Amino acid sequence: MGKRLLDKLWERHVVATNENGLDLLYIDLHLVHEVTSPQAFEGLRLTNRTVRRPDLTFATMDHNIPTKDVWNITDRIAKQQLDTLRENCKQFQVPLADIGDEEQGIVHVIGPELGLTQPGKTIVCGDSHTATHGAFGALAFGIGTSEVEHVLATQTLWQRKPKAMGIELKGKLQKGVYAKDIILHLLSKYGVAVGTGYVMEFYGETIQAMEMEERMTLCNMAIEGGAKAGIIAPDEKTVAYVKGRKYAPRDYETFEKKWFELYTDADAIYDLHISIDVTDLAPYVTWGTNPSMGVRIDEKLPEKHDVNDERAFSYMGLSPGQSTYDIPVQHVFIGSCTNSRLSDLEIAAAVVKGRKVKEGVRALVVPGSKRVRDAAMQKGLHHIFEEAGFEWREPGCSMCLGMNPDQVPEGEHCASTSNRNFEGRQGKGARTHLVSPAMAAAAALYGHFVDTRKESYDGAISYS
């Protein structure tokens, strides 16, 4: 019987197996940020240990950074976490993309763009959305603070091998429908626990047609379905994306041969298989308080089925049977590790070019990294957004989570390109609706959600 992509990735990294069936995995890349690392570094200090492989560790500042005035950090805890990371990286000789550094940005944006993320690697980070890097054929997953310390000290991690889930995507997406809509559809149909105990492998003709940044969006939200990770087999697009980046390997012939061996064999069998035809897929909007509470833009909000629905409707200030077009939008956030890359900003800019943000709507565009921001500005995207009435910010996690000054006021609705819509995620009492960059941009213009399939834009920007 053939092997799945998961099998090949796992077997390449097993150092030892214990009597309980746990495998000790070697970790090829450890990404670090300011929120989940302080206790881990302190643990090293207390036990008189060093970081075993500083060269396989890379840190950045992202969660706590203000995106309007990056140096004006008024929150005491946020400032302490940022200062502590700076001190820890200096003491333990860990590379750090500090505030203002050209390599700084959201950890799951800078990994790929710097070439740190590569096919075949095991990648961990003290962050839920580490699965993003699986788009490159890497086995990438989030870990807890105690595990962060273990990896810092040993460059290994004890893990139980998950099962493999195959998710085949067939068909061509309509104009105005994107990878974000695919993952929101998957979650709305199968729920937030469908992937529990599994690694999701996305494959099929739809995946083959996707560019790398769309693939990253899919893998980023695999965790929202309960999966350990999301992975996609590397192909020519993967290699083309990685090639030439700062930390990418120079011996491409050797690496390409190994990378192209990373695929699921034709006779391999998944532990669970799902097939989705995306041909008739519509843009999605979440209405509730977890990412599976979503509907097509052309559907009414569902009936209440249990106490969770009851609570969600109450928190969101919405009602069963309500039209998605009638959901008010007071805030728009285009950013996060899910949708803050250059192509995301280009799509949003195409929607708003020559138009104006609806009066009473506050709209933010927060690039995922310094490099994304610079590239967008070279193409003039900042002018398009600012002329439309958007705020153009510095890179950071921003309004994805309530850990910095960018928050949604209590009781107000936000169209957000982020990945989580839990109660209070964007601030106390904030009401979050997860959507694609196109849907968020369009909502800023109308003050409510509209069907981006019917918008008269071509999805491309002319820079002449």
From Swiss-Prot:
Q: In which pathway does it act?
A: Amino-acid biosynthesis; L-leucine biosynthesis; L-leucine from 3-methyl-2-oxobutanoate: step 2/4
UniProt keyword Cytoplasm present: no
| Domain of life per record | Bacteria
Keywords from the UniProt entry: 4Fe-4S, Amino-acid biosynthesis, Branched-chain amino acid biosynthesis, Iron, Iron-sulfur, Leucine biosynthesis, Lyase, Metal-binding
**Pfam name, any one:** Aconitase
Question: Where does the chain bind [4Fe-4S] cluster?
Answer: 337, 397, 400
Q: What InterPro entries does the record tag this protein with?
A: 3-IsopropMal_deHydase_lsu, Acnase/IPM_dHydase_lsu_aba_1/3, Acoase/IPM_deHydtase_lsu_aba, Aconitase_4Fe-4S_BS, Aconitase_4Fe-4S_dom, IPM_dehydratase_rel_enz, IPMI_cat
Catalytic activity, as annotated: (2R,3S)-3-isopropylmalate = (2S)-2-isopropylmalate
The record, for Gene3D superfamilies, names:
Aconitase, domain 3
User: How is the cofactor bound here?
Assistant: Binds 1 [4Fe-4S] cluster per subunit.
| Required cofactor(s) | [4Fe-4S] cluster
Q: Name one GO molecular function term.
A: metal ion binding
- What EC number(s) does the entry state? 4.2.1.33
A GO biological process of this protein is:
L-leucine biosynthetic process
Annotated function: Catalyzes the isomerization between 2-isopropylmalate and 3-isopropylmalate, via the formation of 2-isopropylmaleate.
- HAMAP family recorded: LeuC_type1
* Subunit architecture: Heterodimer of LeuC and LeuD.
Q: Which family does it belong to?
A: Belongs to the aconitase/IPM isomerase family. LeuC type 1 subfamily.
Per its record, how is this protein called by name? 3-isopropylmalate dehydratase large subunit
Please give the organism: Bacillus cereus (strain AH187)
Gene behind the chain: leuC
